[in-house]
Amino acid sequence: MKYPLLALIKLYQWTISPLLGPVCRYYPSCSHYGYTSIDRHGAIKGTALTAWRILRCNPWSPGGVDHVPPRKRPRWHELLRNALRGEKGGESAADVPSGGSVSEPPGPAAETSPNAQGA
């Protein structure tokens, strides 16, 4: 359902919008806002955001910059993700010592003073 709506907005932008000229009081324009919101949030929520934007775009509105809100993940998604990460367990690569039995001599970086300025 998302792609037919996006096609209708593009059709409007290519045919009707050039005839009307720049009449939108907001940046980005209402049609660009609608395209982005439907593309980002899907057909239902994107259409609702677009309808609310078109209702706000009127001669009594001051206008201004109004970007599409970012997509938010629901709270249950974050809890589930954290629970799954906790179940994996095990040690990370940072916790495991390197497997070399031969110790390497300290390099030149270990010999320099911490206040030295390098090139």
Curated annotation (Swiss-Prot):
Subcellular location: Cell membrane
Span list, region Disordered: 82-119
Primary location class: membrane
Membrane topology reported for the UniProt record: Peripheral membrane protein
Keywords: Cell membrane, Membrane
Signal peptide: none
InterPro entries: Membr_insert_effic_factor_YidD
Keyword Cell membrane in annotation: yes
GO cellular component: plasma membrane
Function recorded in the entry: Could be involved in insertion of integral membrane proteins into the membrane.
The family this protein is said to belong to: Belongs to the UPF0161 family.
Protein name listed in UniProt: Putative membrane protein insertion efficiency factor
Source organism per UniProt: Streptomyces griseus subsp. griseus (strain JCM 4626 / CBS 651.72 / NBRC 13350 / KCC S-0626 / ISP 5235)
Lineage of producing organism: Bacteria, Bacillati, Actinomycetota, Actinomycetes, Kitasatosporales
